[in-house]
Amino acid sequence: MMSRSENDISVERTESSEIRFKSKKKDPPPETSESIRRRRLIILSFWVVIVTIGLPIWWSTTAIYRAKLPLNQMTDWANGKVCRPVFPLRISIQADSLSVHDARNLVRTTQHALDDLNDFPAHHLRLQLHPSNHSVTADEFSTGDAQEVALVIRLIPSAEIKASLHPHLSVLDIYYTSKQVPVSYSSSSPLTTYITNQLRALFSEERTLISHLLSTSNIEQSTEYRTSDTIQKWTSHRMKYSPSYHLTFSLFTPTSTPTTWPIASALETYIHPLLELLHPISDFSIDTQIQFYASPGVSVPILRKEDLSLFVNAAEWPLSPSIGGGPTINFIIFVGDMEVDGGAKSWLIPQWGGVVILPPSEIEDLEPAMLIFAKQLLSLLGAPETGSLPFRLQTLSRVLSASLLLKASSTLGSLARLSLALPSIAIPRSVADGVTKSITSLHAACEGLGGLKGLQHARSAEREAEKAFFEKSMVGQVYFPDEHKIAVYLPLLGPIGVPLTVGAIKELRAWIKRKTWTL
């Protein structure tokens, strides 16, 4: 019994000793200095590649390029600090029937009368004496610079005093009597008063339009602006300015006749000459069409005023809203016997086009319709309603010059505020170049206001400013939130960044520990 227990004890001791022997771990051999150096070089090489190659590539491919913009200049233009639009219109007085002394005295007294009545310094009439025995030609009104003559006044002796505006030139014929000529010692005369009143009445609409444009800008005015029926009609009728327009001339008939109409010759005779005169303002393209079995939106013999807006059947008539890059102006001839309440046969649709109703018997003679369309086109473009055609076109060019200059300045200011409000927005080099070109054109337009060159520079400034503001590549990163960026970088930073960072930290601790032991 005793011997058996001793054997059991010896077996247990043997098993325990074997267990203790098996559980004992063997220490790894110490690292050689070569292996430590190799491990450090491997970790260092990874970080060198990341810092010298990876980070620069990442920075160059993800950085948002922002070209430098002249923000101060852009803001100054928007606030009206650089240019105050001024239109010094030159009026030439041709007085061959008067002596040089009397003619100069008339110019002097009339200029004083105009200056005393002028309450709008941005629109100033400057009188000058026209050369004697010098005939008036169209070239005097198309020099292109700001020194061109806006109007020539021809004084013609007559039995009564009256005024007549030339239909084909910017010439105002004033007929006067000998009793109305100012004497040398007089500061005023009936002729002086008459010329002053005629000039103020002739340029009143232009003065009102320019005053309205300046009142809607950031430019300070010395006079208080008041709205008028002219402004309300002008702003509601005219179309938004565009460098190009498309004109569509349509013939709509409720039956199958007529199958042809002399539109080609009518356009060549009445519309194309007008478009040539309008070429400095905008470019125009034309197309024509005939639509059979076209029923109007309102079928009554007498069209009331409230029916005019419903007459055009936009649901069934093939009227394209726009062709090409510019807006479309629609001119419609409807074959029918109806008329507008009051006896009219035509009406203007604001910011859209015009409609003329012609009986079937008059469809071969399109002269009345084309003349109406020409008048409607000028109204849609913003030309004044009074005056001869050359005078109206000159007024339109000056008003557009002011409008485009102010619009380009406002667009530059909006672009400056946008770049400051959105630091993450990209600004390509093309935007900076467009801003530079726009500012250069603005300076040239401001110096040449009143002439065709000023209008051309204003068009260029507005075009470059709009092109820079609506650059598509600027908004590419605006709608890419930071959460999306984190989702893109996490798969890269997790598997690669964590092991490299942990390895570098462990190696740094080991190096510090070895330095401590050596000390």
Where are these regions (language model features)?
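C-terminal single-pass membrane-anchor helix
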Residues: 483-518
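Intrinsically disordered, low-complexity regulatory segments enriched
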Residues: 63-64, 82, 322, 352, ...
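Extended, non-transmembrane interaction/recognition domains
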Residues: 162-413
